[in-house]
């Protein structure tokens, strides 16, 4: 009961690969989001095993098919209401090379890049889903940047910590 109340999935749909599904969760603070990601994978694995199945969160379970990503949506605002998203995006772009080893922890993680809608270059776009960072047209509480390179095998705790630190890099101002 409580797990499902905290998780708050907003939508889900079948993705491009066989048996591949995307589940989007309601935004939350980084610690809650990391807890939810870990709990979600544990619940899915448990339900799959109970039903004689296996859930696969690996980045590239089937060669020649789309891989699995763990897109991270980031939104932030300063206490005084000043715009901070450009700085956060600049920090992530500046530090992504060093962070990638933690966001993509296995060799197969890199087989995913550049295929289907997985990013190939350090770039951003307002709508192109094949870019590293996508900035959806959403406004208000849903205004965000979406980092598309992490895969489901990364530690969400470490990933969120690295992204926050990169976004707060004041040397880029």
Please name every model-derived segment:
Residues 1-4:
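Short, small-residue-biased leader/transition segments that mark boundaries at the very start
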Residues 8-14:
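Short, flexible active-site-proximal loops enriched in glycine and acidic residues
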Residues 11, 26-29:
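Intrinsically disordered, low-complexity linker/loop segments enriched in Gly/Pro
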Residues 14-15, 61:
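Residue-level "edge-of-site" marker
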Residues 15-23:
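Short, conserved phosphate-binding/catalytic loop or strand-edge motifs used
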Residues 22-25, 68-70:
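Short secondary-structure transition/capping segments
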Residues 31-173:
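Active-site capping/gating regions of soluble enzymes
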């Amino acid at each position: 009961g409580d797990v499902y109340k905290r998780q708050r999935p907003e939508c889900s749909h079948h993705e491009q690969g066989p048996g591949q599904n995307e589940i989007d969760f309601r935004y939350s603070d980084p610690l809650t989001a990391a807890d939810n990601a870990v709990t979600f994978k544990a619940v899915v694995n448990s339900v799959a095993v109970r039903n004689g199945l296996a859930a696969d969160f690996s980045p590239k379970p089937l060669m020649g098919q789309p891989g699995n990503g763990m897109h991270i949506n980031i939104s932030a605002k300063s206490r005084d209401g000043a715009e901070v998203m450009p700085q956060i995006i600049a920090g992530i772009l500046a530090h992504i090379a060093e962070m990638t080893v933690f966001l993509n922890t296995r060799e197969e993680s890199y087989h995913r890049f550049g295929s289907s809608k997985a990013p190939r270059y350090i770039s951003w776009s307002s709508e192109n889903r094949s870019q590293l960072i996508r900035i959806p047209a959403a406004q208000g509480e849903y205004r965000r940047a979406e980092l598309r390179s992490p895969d489901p095998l990364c530690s969400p705790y470490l990933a969120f910590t690295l992204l926050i630190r990169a976004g707060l890099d004041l040397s880029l101002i």
